[in-house]
Amino acid sequence: MFINRWLFSTNHKDIGTLYMIFGAWAGMVGTGLSILIRAELGQPGSLLGDDQIYNVVVTAHAFVMIFFMVMPIMIGGFGNWLVPLMIGAPDMAFPRMNNMSFWLLPPSFLLLLASSMVEAGAGTGWTVYPPLAGNLAHAGASVDLTIFSLHLAGVSSILGAINFITTIINMKPPAITQYQTPLFVWSVMITAVLLLLSLPVLAAGITMLLTDRNLNTTFFDPAGGGDPILYQHLFWFFGHPEVYILILPGFGMISHIVTYYSGKKEPFGYMGMVWAMMSIGFLGFIVWAHHMFTVGMDVDTRAYFTSATMIIAIPTGVKVFSWLATLHGGNIKWSPAMLWALGFIFLFTIGGLTGIVLSNSSLDIVLHDTYYVVAHFHYVLSMGAVFAIMGGFVHWFPLFTGYTLNDTWAKIHFTIMFVGVNMTFFPQHFLGLAGMPRRYSDYPDAYTTWNTISSMGSFISLTAVILMVFMIWEALASKRVVKSVPLTSTNLEWMHGCPPPFHTFEEPAFIKSSSK
């Protein structure tokens, strides 16, 4: 029974729960790695060995947080749970493939951990650039294991993407058009398209790196007519869409949360929101070289990538102001989920503004590989993606479990986390402007003050993570059952009660067509 339900599952709700638990576990590993980084940087001087081990920790932190925390929770967890419920489908289009997508992740995770355990580990950064990732600078199996780990995670995501695209296009009730599906469903579909188009390019790049390392090919070795810059183009053609993959489902969740707790029946500017997400998805593919302003591209190439990158701010602005317009005039309920959503809007906007700064190629020459970049992407990830995950979690927790979280603890948790992440990452803007470079385990004494404050902030965030574990335990132990959920007519996922039955929509939903 247990094995059939949890190992051979074909139920989107159970698989979503598995993704959630896996993501939470990986999130703790990733948090532990980030604490190691901040402990090392809390004071000048060495704490944990040399720069190689430091860079192994940094690399593992990035991979774990991206591939095993944010993506499994947002796409695998929330996506699996909510998409079928929101479109009235009995399950995903390919339920067994759905199970395989999940079970490819634990082996992938184990391969990544194994890469740190053998030889000196993969201290390449998450970009895995050759020649540092070649078999001279990284002899041994570490980088090879990392490549295999990425292959598995990539296959998992591609299969998941095929599944979501098919489900969303094909499994809606006949009366519903694509433009009547909720924004979270749209965000997952656009994310899936991005995954489907970008991951094969990453797979090609790391496969060539694998053959360069082991079969004496020279794709990225000038000695044999190759070029390391080719690898950078291949990697970032995946890497830039990837950062939009990480944030787009968050956009969808924030739209739902803001609408719900503003007491509105629909978000402001639904069509604008959809087109903005599609624009972001499209533009995300034609800006990749803004990660490469320092490699010596032509001035006209840099001018193009600067302009194209800045254009992404327009659809992003459409989304931010539509969220604010949704809030406007609403009967606002200051629930924990709403606090996360408001925190998201504010902090994501700050992260977006530093992104506009970095898009200027001439400025980026100075700021590239400094802590300014670290501050920028942690504002959009550690306070964008993570705040969206937390907001979605406290909002839909009653749906997933049937129990309610303690409201007071949840608000305290938000406050601690808000203070912690800002104390961690705001000072890093100053460090970057002062020229402190990334990926070094030590630094000149002049940078001590802000690093110490940043490290103290990371421990405040750690406190928040521990408090969240307590909150979940408290909710599951107290068993406060959900009495009623308001606004179910415009929030289809709540219609079956909390938690919904194992099987939903086994008979097709009846849709009344509204004449507009």
UniProtKB/Swiss-Prot annotation:
Gene Ontology cellular-component terms for this entry are:
mitochondrial inner membrane; respiratory chain complex IV
Q: Which residues lie on this side of the membrane: Mitochondrial intermembrane?
A: 41-50, 118-140, 213-227, 287-298, 358-370, 434-446
> What transmembrane ranges does the database entry give?
12-40, 51-86, 95-117, 141-170, 183-212, 228-261, 270-286, 299-327, 336-357, 371-400, 407-433, 447-478
Reported cofactor(s) = heme; Cu cation
Q: Does the keyword Signal apply?
A: no
The family database entries (PANTHER family) matched by this protein are listed as:
CYTOCHROME C OXIDASE SUBUNIT 1 (PTHR10422:SF18)
Protein's name in the database: Cytochrome c oxidase subunit 1
